[in-house]
Amino acid sequence: MADKQISLPAKLINGGIAGLIGVTCVFPIDLAKTRLQNQQNGQRMYASMSDCLIKTIRSEGYFGMYRGAAVNLTLVTPEKAIKLAANDFFRHQLSKDGQKLTLPKEMLAGCGAGTCQVIVTTPMEMLKIQLQDAGRIAAQRKMLAAQAQLATQGGGQPSVEAPAAPRPTATQLTRDLLRNHGIAGLYKGLGATLLRDVPFSIVYFPLFANLNQLGRPSSEEKSPFYVSFLAGCVAGSAAAVAVNPCDVVKTRLQSLERGVNEDTYSGFLDCARKIWRHEGPSAFLKGAYCRALVIAPLFGIAQVVYFLGIAESLLGLLQEPQA
């Protein structure tokens, strides 16, 4: 069966709707992932995802779990739209007379989609990580200040709390990065983002397409929406875990603020080498469980919205009065 002609506006709208719904549902888990990945040996603020979320609520309130969400909600629409539309475009260009794509061509289409999306993904992740990790650094400094005060007072209760550091905002961060580093400041970690997102797309899109094909009743029908959802969840979580080592390195490289006694890095290889040497190979899987929990529903929801054709329906309603 020939693929239907791509409607770019519809694909962009579908990707945007899916991104907004998905981010709203899973952002607290993404915050826990960032904070767990940024923990280096020594001071460990959080033992697990649940411990991180509980401590975040206690110290920063419920909305502390959504710190940095505004950046994601603003930029996830173009990011997801570019990713899904680019994959559709490349699949359409690589197909011949509607024939099923071979695996190498599916991987090539995914590679193209992953490369296109980093235009938006890199600055979005750069800003989001600073906002998400600010609470961890503030809590660590407060704890260390309290411990130091206890030591000087001989075990008595601390009489004065450490002054709270002002919370950064996305606007302040953007202004500072542009003023001090130019546009390159927003694209710090671009190489690491490419090394994460291109392999992710190479794994995700072919795996999703084949899993979704398995649940299709016949070659002339679409897969049921629940099949698309499950295929998106399975493919998303598998791809997320596969590229988690690159995500750990990317998160460390894009973090501007460091906690006490935490390493600094000069580049991707330097970061990977120091993580291996100081924390062991298991450190590359930090946050993998959280990342799978984030990506699975995010891409499951995305594919359901995409395959239900919500945007096509909306655009059709808008065009009806003109008919």
Curated annotation (Swiss-Prot):
GO terms for molecular function: amino acid:proton symporter activity; L-aspartate transmembrane transporter activity; L-glutamate transmembrane transporter activity. PROSITE patterns: SOLCAR. Detected in insulin-secreting beta-cells and pancreatic islets (at the protein level). Gene3D superfamilies: Mitochondrial carrier domain. The chain crosses the membrane at residues 12-32, 62-82, 107-127, 189-209, 223-243, 292-312. It comes from the Eukaryota. Mitochondrial glutamate/H(+) symporter. Responsible for the transport of glutamate from the cytosol into the mitochondrial matrix with the concomitant import of a proton. Plays a role in the control of glucose-stimulated insulin secretion. This is Mitochondrial glutamate carrier 1. It comes from Rattus norvegicus (Rat).
